[in-house]
């Protein structure tokens, strides 16, 4: 596990160990992970995460090029999943004061609800 303090890192470790069954796994590779994840703000959501603990996009370095490229592959798979299932999607990525989970992750959603 990359970071014991990070909820996303702990979740990825449990899923990889087969101890936490998420919704359907959409993409799983050395660097990225995407799964169908219920969310109170959307009828349908796929969470796309880096497996390496990187808190924000501002923490990316040139050494993370492979992670970024693979994250885009995971994002493509998640997007196609929602195109096939719902016909469309929105992509959300929070940073700064809007980022509750300090681990790079992208929400690929169908119809985001207003609070």
Region locations from a protein language model:
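HIT superfamily nucleotide-processing domains
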Residues: 1-115
């Amino acid at each position: 596990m990359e970071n014991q303090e990070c909820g996303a890192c702990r979740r990825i470790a449990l899923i990889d160990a087969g101890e936490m069954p998420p919704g359907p796994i959409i993409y799983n590779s050395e660097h990225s992970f995407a799964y169908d994840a219920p969310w109170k703000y959307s009828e349908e959501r796929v969470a796309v995460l880096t497996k390496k603990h990187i808190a924000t996009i501002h923490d990316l370095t040139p050494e993370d090029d492979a992670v970024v490229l693979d994250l885009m592959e995971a994002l493509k798979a998640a997007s196609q999943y929602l195109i096939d299932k719902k016909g469309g999607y929105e992509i959300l990525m929070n940073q700064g004061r809007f980022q509750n989970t300090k681990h790079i992750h992208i929400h690929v959603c169908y119809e985001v609800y207003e609070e």
